[in-house]
Amino acid sequence: MIKPLIEFCVGNLASGSQAALEKLEKDPNLDVMEYGCLGYCGICFEGPFALVNGEVVQGSTVEELVNNVYEYLDENPMF
């Protein structure tokens, strides 16, 4: 079974999205990855974000980011 891919930039983790990564890693239905740089420096500077199946998902807080990731997945099923 292919799982949704959630990607985080290490620079954004240092800026506060580490808690979102840790929460999402607990979900066995997600593949959560961490990379050195995803090339979204402007977005990274603005606040917490992740790539969800290749699409940028943002939040003004860690909690909002996690909620927005799940909302994106609900609205954009893989199959």
From Swiss-Prot:
Cross-referenced Pfam families: DUF1450
Database matches in InterPro entries: DUF1450 (IPR009910), UPF0349 (IPR022916)
Highest taxon above the source species: Bacteria
Family statement drawn from the similarity comment of this UniProt entry: Belongs to the UPF0349 family.
Matches recorded under NCBIfam families: PRK13669.1
Protein name: UPF0349 protein BCAH820_5046
